[in-house]
């Protein structure tokens, strides 16, 4: 599966650029008639890091996804990417939710399901999330300068099966455009709070809470691909999967 994704992703990136105009026309007609919008995305990263934890053993990870939305604010989507910590080296995510604006505040609430083919049912889990964000123009600094802060809260009950901990995720970040350029800077800080396991001290000691942070520099579009480089770190994480480092990300949406 990983080889398939590695071979498929460059073809999807090239193909979506060639046919983007034609697809946009079809989707525009669909959205006008029904309020339904379709979106697709493909990406490649030199290292898949999830909340400070390596999912690809520092190997590259291609990914593809699709989104279906409605003018009411309801949406659903799927995503799959290559990982190395599963019997079948792929992760499949399915999510649905509701997004709207309340004045200047963007609100997003939903459910994200993580599925790992070949693993037991206990490995699969749900994450219920709430995201709040806004954009703050700073015209007194520069005409095209703004910052975009956000907060992301999530709860995953029984993280990996019965008699395993509940997990709370807290994440906050901010992105700032660099005036007069296509570049941007962003900073993210998060915490994974793992509850102690009830009645199982041995398992309780195998998982710890940890903090993580990312510092990213975005280059804007380079040859039609959104390009960025990120430094990541997970202070307090026990294990090699939390080692710090850099990764490069390429992506395209159509």
Q: What are these regions, as identified by a protein language model?
A:
Residues 21-37, 73, 101-106, 118-121, ...:
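Short loop/turn motifs that connect adjacent beta-strands in outer-membrane beta-barrel proteins
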Residues 21-84:
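Short glycine/proline- and aromatic-enriched beta-strand/turn motifs that initiate or cap beta-hairpins
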Residues 34-36, 58-62, 88-92, 105, ...:
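Residues that define the transmembrane beta-barrel architecture of outer-membrane proteins
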Residues 38-42, 64, 74-76, 94, ...:
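Transmembrane beta-strands of outer-membrane beta-barrel proteins
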Residues 44-50, 80-84, 100-102, 113-117, ...:
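Transmembrane beta-strands of outer-membrane beta-barrel pores
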Residues 57-113, 219:
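Glycine- and aromatic-enriched membrane insertion/assembly motifs of diderm outer-membrane
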Residues 125-205:
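Detector for outer-membrane/organellar transmembrane beta-barrel domains
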Residues 219-223, 241-254:
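Outer-membrane beta-barrel "beta-signal"
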């Amino acid at each position: 599966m990983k080889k398939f994704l590695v071979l498929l992703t460059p073809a999807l990136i090239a193909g979506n650029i060639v046919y983007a105009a034609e697809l946009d026309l079809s989707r525009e007609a669909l959205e006008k008639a029904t309020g339904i919008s379709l979106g697709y995305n493909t990406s490649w990263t030199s290292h898949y890091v999830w909340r400070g934890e390596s999912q690809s053993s520092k190997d590259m990870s291609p990914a593809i996804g699709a989104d279906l939305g409605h003018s009411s604010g309801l949406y659903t989507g799927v995503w799959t990417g290559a990982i190395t910590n599963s019997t079948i080296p792929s992760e499949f995510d399915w999510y649905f939710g509701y997004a709207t604006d309340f004045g200047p505040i963007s609100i997003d609430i939903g459910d994200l399901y993580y599925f790992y083919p070949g693993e037991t049912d206990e490995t699969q889990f749900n994450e219920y999330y709430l995201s709040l964000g806004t954009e703050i123009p700073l015209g007194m600094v520069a005409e095209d300068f703004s910052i975009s802060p956000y907060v992301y809260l999530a709860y995953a009950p029984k993280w990996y099966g019965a008699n395993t901990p509940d997990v709370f995720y807290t994440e906050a970040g901010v992105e700032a455009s660099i005036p007069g350029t296509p570049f941007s800077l962003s900073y993210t800080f998060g915490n994974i709070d793992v509850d102690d396991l009830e009645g199982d001290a041995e398992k309780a000691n195998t998982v710890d809470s940890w903090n993580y942070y990312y510092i990213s520099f975005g280059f804007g579009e380079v040859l039609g691909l959104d390009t960025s480089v990120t430094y990541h770190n997970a202070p307090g994480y026990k294990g090699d999967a939390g080692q710090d480092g850099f990764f490069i990300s390429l992506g395209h949406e159509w």
